[in-house]
Amino acid sequence: MRELEEALRDWERYQRIPKKQFLQDRDTQNMVHHAMLLSIQSALDIATDVIAEERLRKPFTYRETFEVLAGEGIIPESLARDLSNLAGFRNVLVHIYWNLDLKQVYAILQHDLTVLRTFSVVMKEHVSESDSADPGGFF
């Protein structure tokens, strides 16, 4: 959880970068891409840890990871949809980085931090509840 929180603080700080600077400066783009990738990957890692710990159905794709949590009632369906979209974006960042739509990346930077913050809150609550029920529990 600590890794996610640190990455989200970076993401939040980078939201203050002016759009013009982001679109024109490759170093700024790389910095933002890295923070976004770490944030999304951290959320995926937390989700897969919960899936493994609770012996839930194994997802076939990163996008499906959050659907598994929603199917078990751990996160809301709407949050799972938004997180699945970010997982798809993560795949683009990793595999198609040379052909990114920078305006779309900037829009995600500005608007999707709340999705990951909500996930963090929900997962902290879930882990806390699980730890109460099973003191030998998570992370």
Where in this protein do the model-derived segments appear?
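Solvent-exposed interaction patches of small proteins and small membrane subunits
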Residues: 1-139
